[in-house]
Amino acid sequence: MPTDLIRYGSISPEMLAYLWLLIEYKNSIMVAGEVATGKTTLLNAFSLFIPPQMKIVSIEDTPEIRLYHENWIAGTTRSGFGGEEYEITMMDLLKAALRQRPDYLIVGEVRGEEAKILFQAITTGHLALSTIHAKSPEAVIRRLNAEPMNIPKIMLEQLNAICMQVRLIYKGRFVRRTKSITEIVEYDPKIDDIILHDVFRWNPEDDTFEFSGESYLLRRIAEFIGISEKEIINELHSRAEFLRNLCKTKPNFEEFVKKICEYKEYHKGD
């Protein structure tokens, strides 16, 4: 649950409010990190911001994603015990998923040639949420651009944001933190590289999360819905305060989704 992550100190209400806005306005997000850093946990948590009526297709090797949406279709790979013709790969599932025309596509982990199909889907307007094994946002770009994925850098700018997960010892105990949320701004042909911008960063000195105050994606959302940058930042803080207060009630899934829907209904037309 998103509220659990806030209570554990893994992420701030502002960061989750930011991800809520990104998901609501169809931005693709990748969660990166090493083993046991909480990548799937965060992916699962912010997937709960997907409106309940939307069609979701998830694809995984091992079933870890847990959603409660009525229109959720879960796909899992299968080894070909009776030969290769009986094998179901990530590529097979991804191709089948796109034929179902989902509103949201969730891929448990991207690591092979299926990334090409995923980015083709993003380029044609599908929203994708996924995880990847990498140590930094820059490493995400390098891995996606290299074998066996081979995603052209100019296509990588279709991905909107990268959440960086870490597991470390802080004040004598193991903790998980969302170390940063980084926006993919654009591909710069002059340097043949992707321009990145950190919107949020974890400060290990006092275990707080810092907002840079500037977001290209929030600016784009503001332009899309016809409001000012100041208004979209105010909306970010409004949603953060809502999530902060929601933590106090320790809601279950049904209560959480109901409150999210009530918030959106109450603020409709603001």
Curated annotation (Swiss-Prot):
One annotated GO molecular function: ATP hydrolysis activity
InterPro entries: P-loop_NTPase, T2SS/T4SS_dom, T4SS_GSP_E_ATPase
Domain of life from the UniProt record: Archaea
Signal peptide per UniProt: none
Record Gene3D superfamilies: P-loop containing nucleotide triphosphate hydrolases (3.40.50.300)
The family this protein is said to belong to: Belongs to the GSP E family.
PANTHER family per record: TWITCHING MOTILITY PROTEIN PILT (PTHR30486), TYPE IV PILUS RETRACTATION ATPASE PILT (PTHR30486:SF6)
Record protein name field: Uncharacterized protein MJ1287
Organism annotation: Methanocaldococcus jannaschii (strain ATCC 43067 / DSM 2661 / JAL-1 / JCM 10045 / NBRC 100440) (Methanococcus jannaschii)
